[in-house]
């Protein structure tokens, strides 16, 4: 039987997406801080505008943040914030 006749399986990484997003945000935050920028203002500017010029190339931060969709970044930030506010 030819290998083209067999069903292939694709396996996703077992690492949750949130971990990657958190790592990206923390790396970007550190890079901004090291360059002397206000990290919160710069990240908000990027999230609102989509302009990668708000993020420096230092520590490959610009490349990292562009690998994640802005809506996914916002979703992760909102989830983290709301989970921290709950007193259940």
From Swiss-Prot:
Any one Pfam family match given in the protein's UniProt record, by short name: IreB
InterPro entries per the UniProt record, alphabetical: IreB
Superkingdom of origin organism: Bacteria
Family per similarity comment: Belongs to the UPF0297 family.
Annotated PANTHER family: UPF0297 PROTEIN YRZL
NCBIfam families given in the database record: PRK05473.1
Stated name of the protein: UPF0297 protein GWCH70_2489
Record organism: Geobacillus sp. (strain WCH70)
């Amino acid at each position: 039987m030819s290998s083209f006749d067999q069903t292939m399986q694709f396996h996703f990484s077992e690492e949750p997406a949130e971990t990657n997003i958190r790592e990206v945000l923390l790396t970007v935050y550190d890079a901004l801080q090291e360059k002397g920028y206000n990290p919160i203002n710069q990240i908000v500017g990027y999230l609102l505008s989509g302009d990668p010029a708000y993020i420096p190339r230092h520590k490959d931060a610009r490349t990292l943040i562009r690998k994640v969709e802005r809506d996914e970044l916002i979703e992760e930030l909102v989830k983290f914030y709301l989970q921290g506010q709950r007193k259940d």
